[in-house]
Swiss-Prot record:
It comes from the Archaea. It comes from Thermococcus litoralis (strain ATCC 51850 / DSM 5473 / JCM 8560 / NS-C). This is ADP-dependent glucose/glucosamine kinase. Its cofactor is Mg(2+). GO terms for molecular function: ADP-specific glucokinase activity; glucokinase activity; magnesium ion binding. One of its GO terms (cellular component) is cytoplasm. Its EC number is 2.7.1.-, 2.7.1.147.
């Protein structure tokens, strides 16, 4: 072993400090970011054992427990709602089921929430990039009722509105409309949380989604008709929310109708040389997933985790590699990233998992690694505080320990790749960046961590490379 574990930890500490300063100085260079398409209201409830047991007992424990073993993956009754929550606890897995029944929607509303936050990947990133990083940010809101608009923080966050025939950019609070409240009910539980004999192996959340607009990737008229004008105000775009698409809708439209519009937006972004990042999220429908993979060549960058990367390998036709990626083998992950780049020609792939991040790029530079380190700090700070208000708060995460298990992985990478230094691997026509992340022992909240990681890395890397 060339260096002791202590030496490596010291090295990463130094790299983290430098990366934070570099990102802090570079972020003001970013002149504008566009975020689309999913914004909603997150109603967060921290589950209480007694309350949950009482509700399960009232509705019928046997019926609810049956749902745990045979999940419908959608909610049309209260027992399905409670069964879904218990299944998520039992497996320690994040799950999201759509609420089809009005009766359950009323029940959810009456059950209430502990706090409201802006939700949806675009909405969460808007409060971070515009509110915390102070980057001028244009965000798509399918609906903009008062309850949602007030969840946007102050700062350079804008929604486009038509005044007569002119498109204006105003803060969401100045564009409130009598529109629908799109609520995602999020039930959070800590590691070890127990209800009856069901115990959570790790902290996570169950989402009951009562939102008909984002479920079909509804696009506002301003985005349908004024997209080119919006594009002129930005250098970067982050697209998310397409994972919910269904093959067919009751009104006769299909996922293709939505993706054709997305593709026309990407063509405009590319014409204006706007760099675009696609936040891939697990897409249940195979045909939709195939179509999303086909769209990747139009993007500059994609962000994903092991479940999403494996699901793409299945589409590409490498079942064996998909399995190995799910099992968490780092070399399989690297192979899969290379396969994805070969297949799509995409310039940048950002992989995030518990403990480490990787970025495979068709260009070189320490900025790629520094952006990953900054993203790790931002995620740790958000996990510690539950919410970020100022970019300076991210500095506090420097004191969070770096994941030592990932530092051991670094040794394996060194053995495999001769050209490996300070987390950077030269792969002839590509560069691979590896960073061990900061792990917060008991996070205040897990909502929006993935969005924080991807958007922080994408914008800070762009800012640093622009200097």
């Amino acid at each position: 072993m060339k260096e002791s574990l202590k030496d490596r930890i010291r090295l990463w500490k130094r790299l983290y400090v430098n990366a934070f300063e570099n990102a802090l100085n570079a972020i003001p260079n970013v002149k504008g970011v566009l975020l689309a398409y999913n914004t909603n209201i997150d109603a967060i409830k921290y589950l209480d054992k007694d309350d949950l047991e009482k509700r399960v007992t009232e509705i019928g424990k046997e019926k609810v427990f049956e749902i745990i073993e045979n999940p419908p993956e959608k909610i049309s009754s209260i027992e399905e709602l409670l069964g879904g929550i218990l299944r998520s606890i039992k497996l320690g897995k994040a799950m999201e089921w759509f609420v089809e029944s009005e009766e359950v929607r009323r029940y959810l509303r009456e059950w209430g929430w502990d706090e409201l936050r802006i939700g949806g990947q675009a909405g969460i990133m808007a409060n971070l990039l515009g509110g915390v990083y102070r980057i001028p940010t244009i965000v798509h809101v399918p609906q903009n009722p008062k309850l949602q608009a007030e969840l946007f923080v102050d700062g350079p966050i804008y929604v486009p509105v038509f005044e007569g025939n002119k498109l204006k950019l105003v803060h969401p609070k100045d564009a409130i409309a009598e529109e629908e409240e799109l609520i995602h009910y999020i039930y959070e539980f800590p590691r070890g949380f127990q209800v009856f004999d069901v115990q959570a192996p790790r902290e996570n959340r169950f989402i009951a989604n009562a939102d008909d607009y984002n479920a079909r990737v509804y696009m506002r008229r301003e985005f349908r008709e004024g997209f080119e004008e919006i594009t002129r105000n930005v250098e970067l775009a982050i697209i998310s929310g397409l994972q919910v698409l269904k093959e067919y809708y009751p009104d006769g439209t299909t996922y293709r109708d939505v993706l054709d519009r997305v593709e026309s937006h990407l063509n405009i972004l590319n014409r204006y040389n706007v760099k675009s990042h696609f936040e891939f999220a697990y897409t249940a429908n195979r045909r939709v997933r195939e179509a999303l993979v086909e769209l990747l060549p139009k993007f500059t960058s994609v962000g994903l985790n092991e479940v999403e990367l494996a699901s793409i390998m299945e589409i590409i036709g490498d079942e064996e590699l998909a399995k190995e990626v799910l099992e968490g083998h780092i070399f399989s992950v690297i192979d899969a990233m290379n396969v994805l780049m070969d297949e799509t020609g995409i310039e940048r792939i950002h992989f995030h998992t518990y403990g480490y991040y990787l970025a495979l790029t068709q260009y070189r530079g320490e900025e790629v690694r520094d952006a990953l380190l900054f993203a790790s700090l931002a995620a740790a700070a958000k996990a510690m505080k539950g919410n970020l208000e100022r970019i300076e708060q991210i500095r506090d995460a420097l004191s969070v320990p770096t994941n030592e298990r990932a530092i051991v992985l670094e040794e394996e990478l060194e053995k495999e790749f001769t050209e490996f230094e300070n987390g950077l691997i030269d792969m002839v026509d590509r560069q691979l960046a590896f960073v061990p992340t900061k792990i917060v022992a008991s996070p205040k909240s897990t909502v929006g961590i993935g969005d924080t990681i991807s958007s922080s890395a994408f914008v800070s890397e762009f800012g640093m490379r622009k200097r």
